Structure formats: structure tokens, C-alpha cells
Amino acid sequence: MLPVLYTGLAGLLLLPLLLTCCCPYLLQDVRYFLRLANMARRVRSYRQRRPVRTILRAFLEQARKTPHKPFLLFRDETLTYAQVDRRSNQVARALHDQLGLRQGDCVALFMGNEPAYVWIWLGLLKLGCPMACLNYNIRAKSLLHCFQCCGAKVLLASPDLQEAVEEVLPTLKKDAVSVFYVSRTSNTNGVDTILDKVDGVSAEPTPESWRSEVTFTTPAVYIYTSGTTGLPKAATINHHRLWYGTGLAMSSGITAQDVIYTTMPLYHSAALMIGLHGCIVVGATLALRSKFSASQFWDDCRKYNVTVIQYIGELLRYLCNTPQKPNDRDHKVKKALGNGLRGDVWREFIKRFGDIHVYEFYASTEGNIGFVNYPRKIGAVGRANYLQRKVARYELIKYDVEKDEPVRDANGYCIKVPKGEVGLLVCKITQLTPFIGYAGGKTQTEKKKLRDVFKKGDIYFNSGDLLMIDRENFVYFHDRVGDTFRWKGENVATTEVADIVGLVDFVEEVNVYGVPVPGHEGRIGMASLKIKENYEFNGKKLFQHIAEYLPSYARPRFLRIQDTIEITGTFKHRKVTLMEEGFNPTVIKDTLYFMDDAEKTFVPMTENIYNAIIDKTLKL
């Protein structure tokens, strides 16, 4: 009997060692899945409550429990939960009483990072009004498109964006849209002010009846994402999805004692849904900055006692490129949440700035699948959790990059790729993993659906991303497919850029694509041009046109002049070869140009310019 007992005890003692050797990530996998399952259980219970428990409800509870706790830190200003609560009450009352807004009326917000963005958003939640988050870099046609597809009745804009507002004001007035600056004075005829109205109303709590019709399926916010259709698409985010946006903050163990620092724009889902909402759910503090500054980043972290930072890959690279200082590790930052971080930058970042736990993730604003690299393996964007896969039925399928479509077998069904091979990420659309789609028509939504994937009648969400899962079940990002690439943390739709470039009088045809640049994340814009007969290329004119109509991250920095633009049998531009050839003047025989910001023109591409870009002495 004793030998059996000793054998059993020895087995128990050896079990952790055996698990570590055979299944080194099992405990982390189980822990992560249990956190997700617990969150899903709580969100299901929130749905069943009457009224439903929304992010707003979580904020109100925090304001009641810890009214004097700092909620927002901005420059030298500190706002408590109670102060933001009362200010958002005033916003809701002003919009309700003086503008006549009611639940369901959409309001577009066109401004940068500042506390007003947060208390306006909370005020809209108290009214039951969805908010359209307009990218403050967009202009003219794109701005009007974003505004119109969400059906907004009111535009609230920063006075800093006066020129952009005035450009589209005649069209907005024609559409009976009310336009207000988030200020107390206006220098634009036809544009009113909102802060004076907010100042003049009560800060007492708003009636729940103002938002009584809000359910989990009610649209809460529209966040814009560029896609293959050219113009930005308004992803519909309902109140149910807002909760799942906080998943990364909760799964990474953020608590009420944390101070989260974000320099990313609040019109992005990362800053709004992960940063702000994650902060609210746990009762933490959010430190805001209007725009990212590499030179001020760590000073801000020390000033605000930051413990958690948000990033995109480019951001951490910028920090690594700053001159080293003796106090590089003199900070309290323990965690970093974000995506797009290259392995070499990751290593350099933690080597220089300390053992900061980096939580890299993969997700999209509108998608129904996401991954988190909770074991923090450098270079991976996430982990394919076996238990998670039982709920979210995703696959990687073979994809023909040249034809820009999935590969199908003789029966017409998609083909799963084995581990270690790159494939298109798709996830089945179910009640547990829904795809809500986009506002402004069904066409864009339908384009993101793949039908008859593995059997007749099934429907999957097409992520548009090529990923790879290795033999250890770690997920790696490979590339984007179709007509979208990513630069400076922003999605760039090639068709939108091509439409703008094609308006120049000497351009007959244009093919826009992204090319990789050594030492940089994503791909930078490049355009192949065919010049009209009897016209000449004019670099200064093209520069002025592009600078006027495109934000800096979307501007093609390289041009390639061609006699013929190649197309496929289905009349799509061929991009693969062009992308592979890049912008090296010693390889490409066609005439190349470089966008020179200092000279405000396109100049001939030379070996010296090319070498300066490769050596990083010329910044892009």
C-alpha cells in the first residue's frame, strides 16, 4: 500500500514539471479562457437587467463610489469622476433642452483629445444618442461621406478645425445639419457655440427616461475604418460590443490603482474602447495627451505616475529612436497594451526602458475575432487558445493574393491552411461571435461576409488579414490583403488615394499601393502613374493637390511613371510585382519621384535619397 501511496505522491509532485515540459502554456491558456468566460458570463447578466447595464452605468457607479478620485488628467488639469459626471449632465441637458435632441439622434464629434471629448461622449450616453467619431485628419469629400453615412443631425467640432468645417458647411446647411463649435465664441457665420449653453444649465442627474429605449443592440458609437470600398466605413458599435472592447484591459489585470496613459486619438477604437472604457470599468485614472510626443512621453509618465501605456508599433519605435537618457528607467510603467509591435523594437524597448509587460493583441474595430499575446512571446500578436476556439470558430484559409480572393477546392469550398502556413483569417458569424456591419447601406457589410466557406449556407467574417499560426499555437500577423494598407498607425484605402490623385489634370490613370520600408512598421504609400498624352508631369502641382486633400499618412511618398498600367483579367490593377519592386532607383528603370516636404514638390528619386531613407537619416 505504501509504495502505491509514494508513487501517487511522487506523481503529484512531478505533475507541474510534466505540464511545464509537455504543455508549457496550459495554465496560462486556462487562466486566460476563464477570464474571458467570466467576462462573457457577466456581460450576459448585464443584458438581462432592466434597464440593461451599459458602460454608462459602470461610470455612474464609479462616480457614486469614488466621486473625488481623479478620472482624467490633461496637461495641468485634474478632473474627478464627480466633476466629469456633473459636466456630462450639463451636456445632456443642453443637447436635450436647447437643441431638442432625443434618444436615437446621432451626433458627430469632430475634435482631438481633450477632456471635453470624454464628457460630451458621456453626455450623449445619458441622452441615449449614438456618437459618430470623426477622424480630425479627413477633409472635404471624405468628411462629408463620414458625416452623411451615420445620419447625424448635429456636428460638434473643435474651433481648431474651423477651416475644415467651413469647407463643408454649405453642404451641411443644405442637409439641415446644425453645426456647433465646442467653444463659447464663433468666427464662422452659420456655426453656433455649445459651451455657453452647457454652462447655463443644471448639473443635476438626468432622468433615466431620456435613455429608456437603450438596449444591448442599440447603436452606441460609429467608428470609422478605411476599407476596400475607398471611402471610410462607419463600423456600428452597439452597447453589447462596447463591453467586449474592455476585454483587453480586464484580461491584462488593470485595476483601480492604475493610471492609463494614451496619446492615441479618441476617435480610434483602441483609445476609446480599450483605454477610456477599460479605465471606467475598473475605476482607474486616464491621462490624456492631445498628440503623441516622443520627447515628452516619459516626462508625462513621470508627471502623472503612469502605470499602463497604450501604443501602436510605430509609437514604441519612436521612443526607442530618441537619445538615451540616464533616467530612461525612472518611471512606474508596468504594462503596455497595443498592437503592431515588431519583434526587434519589442526587445529594444524592454531592454532600454525596463521590464514592462507588453500585451500585444490582434483585433479590428468591426471584426468578430481577436487574439491576445498573454504569454508575451516577442513577435506574436496573440495565441490560438484551444478553449477559445470552441466558442469563436475561426480558421485560416488559403488566399490567392494576386487574384485577391480565397482559394476554393473542386467542390467550391475554402481550404484550411496547416500550421506554419499563411492564410486569410475568417471567423464564423454566430450569436456568440456576431458581425454587426457598417452604417450607410448593406453593400459594405455584405462585402465583409464570406459565404459557403466550408459548407453550403455558412457565413464567415472576412478579416482581410493574412496571419500564421505556428506549431506552438502563437499567432503572427503577415499582411493585409485587398486595397488597404497601414502606415503610421492608420489604415489607408488605396482606392480613395487613387481617386484624389486622379483628379490632377495630367494624370490619366493611377495605381496606388503600399511598399515596405526597412526599419518601419506597415507600408508606405506609392503610386504608379500614367501621364495623359500631350501633358507633362508637374511635381509642384501634384504636391499641392495631395497636401490639400489627403492627410499626411495617406499621401503617396513615391511615384513611378509608367507607359502602361497593368490590369488583371477582371480589370483590377496588378499590385504584387510593384509592391515587391518597391522604390529602389537602381532596380527600377521607370522614372521615380520622391515627395519632398521641404521643397513642397515631387523631386526625382536618386540613390542618395534612397540610401538616406534606408539609413534613416531621412525621416518619412
UniProtKB/Swiss-Prot annotation:
It catalyses: a fatty acid(in) = a fatty acid(out); (9Z)-octadecenoate(out) = (9Z)-octadecenoate(in); a long-chain fatty acid + ATP + CoA = a long-chain fatty acyl-CoA + AMP + diphosphate; (5Z,8Z,11Z,14Z)-eicosatetraenoate + ATP + CoA = (5Z,8Z,11Z,14Z)-eicosatetraenoyl-CoA + AMP + diphosphate. This is Long-chain fatty acid transport protein 2. GO terms for cellular component: endoplasmic reticulum; endoplasmic reticulum lumen; endoplasmic reticulum membrane; mitochondrion; peroxisomal membrane; peroxisome; plasma membrane. Residues 1-4, 128-267 are lumenal. Residues 28-106, 289-620 are cytoplasmic. Gene3D superfamilies: 3.30.300.30, N-terminal domain of ligase-like. Signal peptide: none annotated.
